[in-house]
Amino acid sequence: MSKNNYIIRLERKEEQREVENLVRESFWNVYRPGCFEHFVLNQLRNDDAFVPELNFVLELDGKIIGQVMFMRAVIKADSGRDIDIMTFGPIGILPEFKRQGYGKILLDYALEKAKALGCGAVCMEGNIDFYGKCGFTYAKDYNIRYHGLPDGEDSSFFLCRELIPHYLDGVTGEYKTPDGYMVSENDVEEFDKLFPPKEKLKLPGQIF
Protein backbone atom coordinates (compact mmCIF):
# COMPACT_ATOMS: atom_id res chain seq x y z
CA MET A 1 0.00 0.00 0.00
CA SER A 2 1.30 3.45 -0.84
CA LYS A 3 -0.39 6.81 -0.57
CA ASN A 4 1.19 10.24 -0.72
CA ASN A 5 4.67 9.85 0.76
CA TYR A 6 4.23 6.77 2.96
CA ILE A 7 4.20 3.07 2.26
CA ILE A 8 3.17 0.06 4.39
CA ARG A 9 5.04 -3.17 3.70
CA LEU A 10 6.37 -6.30 5.38
CA GLU A 11 9.40 -6.01 7.65
CA ARG A 12 12.65 -7.28 6.11
CA LYS A 13 15.04 -9.47 8.05
CA GLU A 14 17.91 -7.00 7.75
CA GLU A 15 15.71 -4.30 9.35
CA GLN A 16 14.89 -6.21 12.52
CA ARG A 17 17.30 -4.39 14.83
CA GLU A 18 16.25 -1.01 13.41
CA VAL A 19 12.60 -1.88 14.04
CA GLU A 20 13.40 -3.09 17.57
CA ASN A 21 15.06 0.25 18.24
CA LEU A 22 11.98 2.02 16.88
CA VAL A 23 9.81 0.09 19.35
CA ARG A 24 12.25 0.92 22.15
CA GLU A 25 12.04 4.62 21.31
CA SER A 26 8.25 4.47 21.06
CA PHE A 27 7.70 2.81 24.46
CA TRP A 28 10.63 4.12 26.51
CA ASN A 29 9.44 5.43 29.91
CA VAL A 30 5.80 5.37 28.74
CA TYR A 31 4.30 2.53 30.82
CA ARG A 32 7.28 1.85 33.10
CA PRO A 33 10.83 3.12 33.55
CA GLY A 34 12.49 1.91 30.36
CA CYS A 35 10.48 -0.65 28.40
CA PHE A 36 10.11 -4.36 27.57
CA GLU A 37 8.40 -4.15 24.21
CA HIS A 38 11.49 -4.21 21.97
CA PHE A 39 12.57 -7.50 23.56
CA VAL A 40 9.04 -8.87 23.30
CA LEU A 41 9.12 -8.17 19.56
CA ASN A 42 12.51 -9.86 19.27
CA GLN A 43 11.19 -12.99 20.96
CA LEU A 44 7.83 -13.15 19.21
CA ARG A 45 9.34 -13.34 15.73
CA ASN A 46 10.47 -16.88 16.62
CA ASP A 47 7.21 -17.90 18.30
CA ASP A 48 5.02 -20.56 16.68
CA ALA A 49 2.03 -18.21 16.95
CA PHE A 50 3.76 -15.37 15.06
CA VAL A 51 2.06 -14.33 11.80
CA PRO A 52 4.83 -13.29 9.38
CA GLU A 53 2.26 -12.17 6.79
CA LEU A 54 1.14 -9.45 9.23
CA ASN A 55 4.53 -8.13 10.36
CA PHE A 56 4.34 -4.64 8.91
CA VAL A 57 6.39 -1.46 8.91
CA LEU A 58 5.27 2.01 7.89
CA GLU A 59 7.85 3.92 5.90
CA LEU A 60 7.68 7.69 5.44
CA ASP A 61 9.97 9.35 2.90
CA GLY A 62 12.18 6.26 3.01
CA LYS A 63 12.41 6.17 6.83
CA ILE A 64 10.73 3.48 8.94
CA ILE A 65 8.56 5.31 11.48
CA GLY A 66 6.10 2.63 12.59
CA GLN A 67 5.54 -1.10 13.00
CA VAL A 68 2.90 -3.63 14.02
CA MET A 69 2.94 -7.41 14.33
CA PHE A 70 0.26 -10.06 14.92
CA MET A 71 0.03 -13.34 16.82
CA ARG A 72 -2.44 -16.21 16.57
CA ALA A 73 -4.47 -16.71 19.74
CA VAL A 74 -7.57 -18.52 20.96
CA ILE A 75 -10.68 -17.93 23.00
CA LYS A 76 -11.36 -20.91 25.23
CA ALA A 77 -15.12 -21.17 24.82
CA ASP A 78 -17.22 -22.32 27.76
CA SER A 79 -18.56 -25.02 25.42
CA GLY A 80 -15.08 -26.56 25.28
CA ARG A 81 -14.23 -25.33 21.79
CA ASP A 82 -11.16 -23.28 20.90
CA ILE A 83 -12.14 -20.21 18.86
CA ASP A 84 -9.24 -19.14 16.65
CA ILE A 85 -8.56 -15.40 16.76
CA MET A 86 -5.54 -13.10 16.64
CA THR A 87 -3.97 -10.46 18.81
CA PHE A 88 -1.42 -7.81 17.92
CA GLY A 89 1.38 -5.84 19.45
CA PRO A 90 3.64 -4.25 19.94
CA ILE A 91 2.51 -1.47 17.65
CA GLY A 92 4.94 1.43 17.75
CA ILE A 93 5.38 4.84 16.14
CA LEU A 94 8.53 6.93 16.56
CA PRO A 95 7.84 9.64 19.17
CA GLU A 96 8.25 12.54 16.74
CA PHE A 97 5.53 11.07 14.49
CA LYS A 98 2.97 10.20 17.17
CA ARG A 99 -0.46 11.87 17.28
CA GLN A 100 -0.39 12.46 13.52
CA GLY A 101 -2.67 9.58 12.53
CA TYR A 102 0.02 7.14 11.43
CA GLY A 103 -0.81 4.56 14.10
CA LYS A 104 -4.43 4.39 12.96
CA ILE A 105 -3.42 4.22 9.29
CA LEU A 106 -1.07 1.33 10.03
CA LEU A 107 -3.48 -0.60 12.23
CA ASP A 108 -6.46 -0.16 9.91
CA TYR A 109 -4.37 -1.54 7.04
CA ALA A 110 -3.09 -4.47 9.10
CA LEU A 111 -6.58 -5.39 10.31
CA GLU A 112 -7.84 -5.51 6.73
CA LYS A 113 -4.97 -7.85 5.86
CA ALA A 114 -5.77 -10.00 8.91
CA LYS A 115 -9.37 -10.27 7.74
CA ALA A 116 -8.15 -11.29 4.28
CA LEU A 117 -6.21 -14.13 5.93
CA GLY A 118 -9.45 -15.37 7.48
CA CYS A 119 -9.05 -13.90 10.96
CA GLY A 120 -12.53 -13.62 12.47
CA ALA A 121 -11.77 -11.50 15.53
CA VAL A 122 -8.97 -9.75 17.37
CA CYS A 123 -8.57 -9.38 21.15
CA MET A 124 -5.97 -7.17 22.82
CA GLU A 125 -5.15 -5.00 25.80
CA GLY A 126 -5.26 -1.27 25.18
CA ASN A 127 -6.90 2.12 25.59
CA ILE A 128 -10.42 2.39 24.20
CA ASP A 129 -9.85 6.09 23.48
CA PHE A 130 -7.40 5.15 20.72
CA TYR A 131 -8.44 1.68 19.67
CA GLY A 132 -12.11 2.58 19.63
CA LYS A 133 -11.29 4.69 16.56
CA CYS A 134 -10.17 1.46 14.87
CA GLY A 135 -13.42 -0.35 15.59
CA PHE A 136 -12.61 -1.98 18.92
CA THR A 137 -15.03 -2.19 21.82
CA TYR A 138 -14.95 -3.77 25.27
CA ALA A 139 -14.48 -7.54 25.05
CA LYS A 140 -17.12 -8.01 27.74
CA ASP A 141 -19.67 -6.83 25.16
CA TYR A 142 -18.86 -10.07 23.31
CA ASN A 143 -19.07 -12.13 26.53
CA ILE A 144 -15.31 -12.71 26.47
CA ARG A 145 -13.51 -12.74 29.83
CA TYR A 146 -9.85 -11.97 30.49
CA HIS A 147 -7.89 -14.89 31.95
CA GLY A 148 -7.08 -14.47 35.62
CA LEU A 149 -9.18 -11.35 36.13
CA PRO A 150 -11.65 -11.82 39.01
CA ASP A 151 -15.33 -11.17 38.38
CA GLY A 152 -16.19 -7.54 39.04
CA GLU A 153 -12.66 -6.24 38.41
CA ASP A 154 -12.17 -3.45 35.88
CA SER A 155 -11.77 -5.01 32.43
CA SER A 156 -11.95 -1.79 30.42
CA PHE A 157 -8.41 -2.44 29.12
CA PHE A 158 -9.53 -5.68 27.42
CA LEU A 159 -10.78 -4.95 23.91
CA CYS A 160 -12.14 -6.91 20.97
CA ARG A 161 -13.13 -6.37 17.36
CA GLU A 162 -14.91 -8.77 15.05
CA LEU A 163 -13.39 -8.75 11.58
CA ILE A 164 -15.90 -11.24 10.19
CA PRO A 165 -19.46 -10.19 11.15
CA HIS A 166 -21.13 -12.52 13.67
CA TYR A 167 -17.93 -14.56 14.14
CA LEU A 168 -18.41 -14.46 17.91
CA ASP A 169 -22.17 -14.89 17.93
CA GLY A 170 -23.17 -17.34 20.65
CA VAL A 171 -19.64 -17.52 22.06
CA THR A 172 -18.86 -17.06 25.73
CA GLY A 173 -15.39 -17.80 26.96
CA GLU A 174 -11.99 -16.69 28.16
CA TYR A 175 -8.98 -15.14 26.45
CA LYS A 176 -5.42 -15.58 27.65
CA THR A 177 -2.55 -13.51 26.29
CA PRO A 178 -0.18 -15.79 24.33
CA ASP A 179 2.71 -17.00 26.49
CA GLY A 180 5.26 -15.43 24.15
CA TYR A 181 4.43 -11.99 25.53
CA MET A 182 5.73 -12.97 28.97
CA VAL A 183 9.41 -12.07 29.35
CA SER A 184 11.74 -11.78 32.32
CA GLU A 185 13.19 -8.48 33.48
CA ASN A 186 16.69 -9.98 33.55
CA ASP A 187 16.44 -11.04 29.91
CA VAL A 188 15.21 -7.56 28.97
CA GLU A 189 18.16 -5.97 30.79
CA GLU A 190 20.65 -8.15 28.88
CA PHE A 191 19.00 -7.46 25.55
CA ASP A 192 18.89 -3.73 26.22
CA LYS A 193 22.70 -3.65 26.38
CA LEU A 194 22.69 -4.06 22.59
CA PHE A 195 21.17 -0.59 22.20
CA PRO A 196 22.41 2.96 22.89
CA PRO A 197 22.17 3.89 26.59
CA LYS A 198 18.96 5.62 27.67
CA GLU A 199 17.92 6.89 31.09
CA LYS A 200 15.07 5.09 32.82
CA LEU A 201 12.73 7.53 34.52
CA LYS A 202 9.79 7.07 36.87
CA LEU A 203 7.14 9.37 35.46
CA PRO A 204 3.51 10.24 36.26
CA GLY A 205 1.01 8.08 34.41
CA GLN A 206 3.18 4.97 34.27
CA ILE A 207 1.29 1.81 35.23
CA PHE A 208 4.18 -0.49 36.16
Give names to the regions the model predicted.
Residues 116-119, 126-153:
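Conserved active-site alpha-helix within GNAT-family acetyltransferase domains
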Residues 151-153, 157, 162, 197, ...:
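Cell-envelope/extracellular anchoring and linker segments
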Residues 13-26, 170-204:
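A short, well-structured alpha-helix characteristic of acyl/acetyltransferase catalytic modules
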Residues 1-14, 21:
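Conserved N-terminal entry element of GNAT/NAT acetyltransferase domains
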Residues 80-95:
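Conserved acetyl-CoA binding element of GNAT-fold acetyltransferases
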Residues 20, 27-74:
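Active-site rim helix/loop that mediates acceptor-substrate recognition in acyltransferases
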Residues 97-109, 119:
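Conserved acetyl-CoA pyrophosphate-binding loop and the N-cap/start of the following alpha-helix
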Residues 54, 58, 89-92, 119, ...:
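Internal, conserved structured core segments that host functional sites
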